């Protein structure tokens, strides 16, 4: 049974997002489908953020973050991780978290990089799931 209030959002890393969604009993959607309705109706979001080689968010993620920032995020919970690409530095990633917090969001997990060998999906999901 899916936990409809948890939404895992991905761009090109669909298989990884679906694995996380299965572990959480959540729904997974493409970032290209993200709109105000999803943001308003969801309670918790797991964001599989992707960066371009220049260190900027991909265009789809840039648009999605604009959507998040235009919506009241009070009481909503977010866990973010880098699914693809290299984040230029930790401050860049924290800026995303800070923008979500400004909208009222609570960050329950922030920006480990899934491409690092030390990153373990199951461990990360276990660490965030009680707080989603």
Feature map (PLM): residue ranges:
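FMN-binding flavodoxin-like domain, especially the glycine-rich phosphate-binding loop
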Residues: 2-29, 34, 39-132
